[in-house]
């Protein structure tokens, strides 16, 4: 039977004097007396009587033996108590760490910190995403699914089950296919609406066909008879033509337009080619400056010739040296 630590301290087993009383080196009759065991004899007197018998040579050996004996007694007392204590129980002195290992006694909060570290490591590791195997549809299955989608975008459960049996697919796969197909259909509808809005916007008006110009509107407003009839020879019809150059006010009244703006030639040029056939041959020769065959029909050719002569004389006068 092992005694508790207070009883051991009382009878002096942990003290140097108690060990000296039990050491085999001393006298058994004097050291193991009843008074020494019960503690009636003072330790100082026992130590004094024993130290007088011990030689100085054996003093170091006695100290070493006493230290070893004390450690051996302490281990013998602690280990049997750990065997009898269960988890969560305490001994008679309320020490909750005697039934635990040395690492738990030294650092009771170490286990909780280790568990917290494990939890934090598990949280830091990214969770693996569950990947579902993608279903590969055959051409026949896609054809039947598209036909069913054209009939109804939201088929009921019975229709989906019949279609699933027809195409040899699970009903869940058919339902997911219809969901994805409806999403695709909504995206297409939105794209069509946005494209129509962009076409109607004024920003893209420059891409359209150009508007008819004012000149074409003016020409279209003129009657065709005025272009085809020979009344174009008068001045009012010539002035109504687009691009007609009138006589500047600074020129004298005797000025006449050049012969290539002859009303007869203009009328011939404005007639359609289908009615007129090939254009008339060019009348002017090589010496167009000196010979003006078209002016012979014009009664005002004398005034034009006089003006040209004056222009030539002026050019010759400028070119002469002083």
Curated annotation (Swiss-Prot):
Localization (cell): Nucleus
One Pfam family, short name: Homeodomain
Gene Ontology MF, one: RNA polymerase II cis-regulatory region sequence-specific DNA binding
Region named Disordered: 75-136
Chain location of the short sequence motif Octapeptide motif per the record: 32-39
Keywords from the UniProt entry: Developmental protein, DNA-binding, Homeobox, Nucleus, Transcription, Transcription regulation
SUPFAM superfamilies: Homeodomain-like (SSF46689)
Gene Ontology annotations for the cellular component aspect, listed alphabetically: nucleus
DNA-binding stretch(es), residue numbering of this chain: 130-189
Tissue: Highly expressed in anterior neural plate followed by neural retina, pigmented epithelium, in pineal gland, diencephalon floor and epiphysis. At later stages, the neuroretina remains the primary site of expression. No expression in the developing lens and cornea.
InterPro entries found in the cross-reference section: HD, Homeobox_CS, Homeodomain-like_sf, OAR_dom, RAX/RAX2
One GO-annotated biological process of the protein: regulation of transcription by RNA polymerase II
Sequence motif Nuclear localization signal, location on chain: 308-312
Function: Plays a critical role in eye formation by regulating the initial specification of retinal cells and/or their subsequent proliferation.
Protein family per UniProt: Belongs to the paired homeobox family. Bicoid subfamily.
Family annotation (PANTHER family): HOMEOBOX PROTEIN, PUTATIVE-RELATED, RETINAL HOMEOBOX PROTEIN RX
Record's protein name: Retinal homeobox protein Rx-A
Protein species of origin: Xenopus laevis (African clawed frog)
Gene name for this UniProt entry: rax-a
